[in-house]
């Protein structure tokens, strides 16, 4: 009987040992970081109902799937991050494009320098907005290319420089990497006031999406590169946010490339915006207003002056409704425009995930 008791005790101790080993392995597996721990998946889907009166007097309305955006961010290593973003926009082509894809090598919490390579919109301009429609500065100057960027940060100061081979090139020259830009930004928070601002330079503003479209067939045969500069800033306090931006070509284009009133154009775009958020019937509601303008930007299809207002209501987490009204004024007849005004009213449903 004693032998049976000893045998049972031995088997019990063996079982307990195996259980402890299994528990230890489970704890180790739980503690070991998984690749999926560093993966973030998200995006947005927007449906818009619009009514537009063009400068020609034509009145149109439509319901569109305005935008679908899907992104995957990963952090496979503490010194490596990646970002891939797909985009569908209602531009008449019904296509899905690779909007952004880049890798960032660095960890600014431990070392101030970093390297970024891939395709994305370069650091030329600040385009944050609480309106539904992008500011005119973005329509004129956003530049999305495959590039290599080197940056440095220190106490809220960010300095970046980048190189790329754009869609535009000089007449008679080979297709090569000869376009570049630089930006300097500063941001922080003090006494409940958050602020951010920056300046940017680009040696060929013609490579922005808006100006490349305006150049048309001349995009690969321009006479010379026209550099551009921009400045932007925003400040937030007590639920109020103020924003502003100014962007300009530093020289005039040739009249045969981008013209204004019979001469070479020197396009300018600017915007001012104010937004205030407060609870309305228990829902966070943002009221925004903007005034924007351009100079010598008729060839880009931009208005001379724009006034607008928008209201965005966060219905539930990740879902909002925005109502926006924009009033645009065209360039005068003597400048090549119609001298007329137009408007666009938009109701947007946006779901983020």
Regions found by a protein language model. Name each.
Residues 3-6, 77, 294:
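Compositionally biased, intrinsically disordered low-complexity segments enriched
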Residues 168-169, 207:
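Active-site environment of divalent metal-dependent phosphoester hydrolases
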Residues 53-59, 101-108, 191-353:
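Outer-membrane beta-barrel pore domains
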Residues 30-168, 174-181, 185-201, 235, ...:
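Outer membrane beta-barrel
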């Amino acid at each position: 009987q004693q032998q049976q008791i000893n045998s049972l005790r031995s088997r019990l101790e063996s079982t307990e040992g195996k259980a402890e080993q299994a528990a230890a392995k489970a704890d180790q597996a739980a503690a070991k970081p998984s690749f999926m721990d560093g993966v973030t998946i998200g995006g947005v889907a927007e449906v818009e109902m619009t009514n537009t009166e063009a400068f020609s007097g034509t009145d149109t309305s439509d319901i569109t799937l305005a935008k679908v955006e899907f992104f995957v961010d990963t952090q496979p290593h503490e010194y490596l991050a990646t970002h891939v973003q797909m985009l569908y926009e209602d531009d008449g082509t019904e296509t899905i494009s690779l909007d952004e894809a880049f890798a960032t090598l660095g960890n600014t919490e431990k070392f101030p320098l970093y390297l970024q390579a891939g395709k994305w919109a370069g650091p030329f301009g600040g385009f944050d907005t609480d309106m539904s429609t992008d500011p005119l500065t973005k329509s004129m100057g956003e530049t999305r290319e495959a590039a290599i960027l080197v940056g440095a940060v220190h106490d809220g100061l960010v300095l970046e420089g980048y190189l790329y081979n754009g869609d535009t090139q000089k007449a008679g020259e080979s297709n090569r990497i000869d376009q570049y830009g630089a930006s300097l930004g500063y941001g922080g928070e003090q006494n409940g006031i958050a602020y951010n601002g920056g300046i940017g330079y680009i040696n060929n503003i013609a490579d922005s999406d808006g100006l490349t479209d305006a150049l048309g067939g001349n995009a690969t045969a321009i006479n010379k590169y026209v550099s551009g500069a921009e400045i932007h800033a925003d400040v937030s306090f007590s639920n109020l946010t103020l924003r502003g931006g100014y962007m300009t070509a530093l020289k005039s284009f040739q009249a045969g490339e981008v013209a204004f009133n019979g001469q070479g154009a020197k396009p300018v775009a600017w915007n001012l915006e104010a937004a205030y958020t407060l609870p309305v019937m228990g829902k966070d509601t943002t009221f925004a207003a903007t005034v924007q303008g351009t100079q010598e930007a008729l060839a880009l299809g931009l208005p001379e002056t724009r006034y607008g207002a928008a209201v965005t209501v966060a219905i539930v987490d990740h879902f909002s409704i925005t109502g926006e009204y924009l009033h645009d004024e065209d360039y005068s007849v003597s400048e090549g425009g119609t001298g007329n005004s137009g408007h666009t009213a938009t109701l947007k449903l946006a779901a983020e995930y």
